[in-house]
Amino acid sequence: MNCYLILTVALLLTSAMTGTTTAGQLNKKGVTLREDDRFPCNAGNCACLPLDSYSYTCQSPTSSTANCEGNECRSEADW
């Protein structure tokens, strides 16, 4: 019993100390990292990859793209 407890605690500490996140976890902006070819936004919006982030944000196609990488906001058709 004690062996299992020690092993569990060791695994939890190792996981906590690495600071890694698993695929699919949300970032601060609430959009998951791109894992596959699914479009991350609702219909009618476009996906912007901000210059200071690794995750897409969803915005209206008429919004400014000045903060988007490549100055573009990708539509579902262009995804």
From Swiss-Prot:
Residue spans making up a coiled coil are none
Q: Name one GO molecular function term.
A: toxin activity
Question: Does the record's keyword annotation contain Disulfide bond?
Answer: yes
An annotated GO cellular component of this protein is:
extracellular region
**Sorted alphabetically, which keywords does the UniProt record give?**
Disulfide bond, Neurotoxin, Secreted, Signal, Toxin
- Principal location class: secreted
Signal peptide from the UniProt entry: 1-23
Tissues expressing the protein: Expressed by the venom duct.
The question of whether Metal-binding is a record keyword is answered with no
Q: List the disulfide bonds.
A: C41-C58, C46-C68, C48-C73
Highest taxon, organism lineage: Eukaryota
Q: Which residues form the propeptide?
A: 24-37
Q: Where in the cell is it found?
A: Secreted
Comment on protein domains: The cysteine framework is IX (C-C-C-C-C-C).
Please report the name of this protein according to its UniProt entry.
Answer: Conotoxin Cl9.3
Please tell me the species this chain comes from: Californiconus californicus (California cone)
